[in-house]
Amino acid sequence: MSHPPKLRLGVNVDHIATLRNARGGRAPDPVRAALLAIEAGADGITAHLREDRRHIRDDDMARLKAQISRPLNFEMAATEEMVRIALATKPHACCLVPERREELTTEGGLDVVGQHNALAPAIARLSEAGIRVSLFIAADPAQIEMAARLRAPVIEIHTGGWCDAITDGHHDKADAEWQRIVAGARQAYAAGLEVHAGHGLDYATAEQIAALPEIRELNIGYFIMGEALFVGLAESVRTMRAAMDRGRDRATGATA
C-alpha cells in the first residue's frame, strides 16, 4: 500500500505566555519559543487568544504573524471580537474552539450540531478572507457530519479523553476512545475533510496516533513545554518529531 504524507507538527506556545503572565513583564517570550520550535522542526505554531487573555495577548498574535516563517494557527472562540481580530491578523488558519472562563484548558470539543447557526457566519467570513478554518470537535459521527456540512475544510479531533484514560490507567475506556478516534478520522477523511488531532498528547500517544494515515497534523503544547523544563525546548520538539516520524513509518494508505 502507498505511504501517506509526512505528518505535520504544530507546536502550541500558550504555556510560555502562561509562565510570563504569572509574574508579569515580557519574559519568557512566546515568540522566541515559537522561533526556537520552528528551528527544531515544528511545521507550524498554534496560539489561543482567549477572551480573558489569560495567556496569549493581542500583541503576541500580531508578533507571531509578523515574525515566524511557518503557518500560524490562531485558536479562538467564534465570537465577533475574535473574528474581527483574526481578519486583521490574517493567520494561515483559525481553529474554532469552545471556551468557558472557569476552565483551566479547553475541556471538550465544539458542539457544531447545536451551534451550527452561530458557527456558519464565522466560518464563511474567515474562509472568504483566505483563512483556513478548522473545527475542534470530538470524534463523534454527528459532529463530523455537521462539520462537513458547514464546509469547514479541516477538523481537529479532541484526543483528551483518550490521553486522560491512558494516564489514569483506565484501559477499557482508553481502548474505546481510541476506536472512536480511528473511526472518526476515517469518517472525516471519507467526507473530504482534512483531519488534525490534539489535546493531551505525549511522546507515546503521538507516536501511536501518527500511524493513522488519515491524520495530517498534530497540535501539541503542554507536554512539549513541560518536557522542555528538563531537556530544553529544542530537544523536546525534536524528540516529539522523532516519535511522530516513527509512528508515521507504520502508516499506509490515505495518500490523497
UniProtKB/Swiss-Prot annotation:
Listed EC numbers: 2.6.99.2
An individual GO BP term: pyridoxine biosynthetic process
Which EC class, in a word?
A: transferase
* Disulfide bond entries: none
What domain of life?
A: Bacteria
State its role: Catalyzes the complicated ring closure reaction between the two acyclic compounds 1-deoxy-D-xylulose-5-phosphate (DXP) and 3-amino-2-oxopropyl phosphate (1-amino-acetone-3-phosphate or AAP) to form pyridoxine 5'-phosphate (PNP) and inorganic phosphate.
Provide the assembly information.
Homooctamer; tetramer of dimers.
Q: What is this protein called?
A: Pyridoxine 5'-phosphate synthase
